[in-house]
Amino acid sequence: MGGRDLIQQFEWDAEKEKANIKKHGIDFETAKYVFNDEYRVEFLDSAHSTLKEFRYITIGFVDQMLTVIYTDRNDAIRIISARIATMKEARLYYDDNNKIYS
């Protein structure tokens, strides 16, 4: 993992983070560094987006492969949840990055 020099602003709900740690074992302070992964894969989470709020899924590497759900709010990235990536998500990451080297 490269340096931890984030330029984005991040925010999250502290109670939601506590619930996320209990459920997934990942704190949002760590999860925000997935945005430093220049090879991360991002796409719209259309199943959970609304007309008022678009949600996104990003898959990237911190110390392990993580999946982070977030939205853009008030010029900040608002983290909604974070967990260890599933095998399917890890495959998306590696398949997408194999295109770079092909």
Task: Enumerate the language-model features and the residues they cover.
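Ribonuclease/tRNase effector modules and their secretory precursors
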Residues: M1-S102
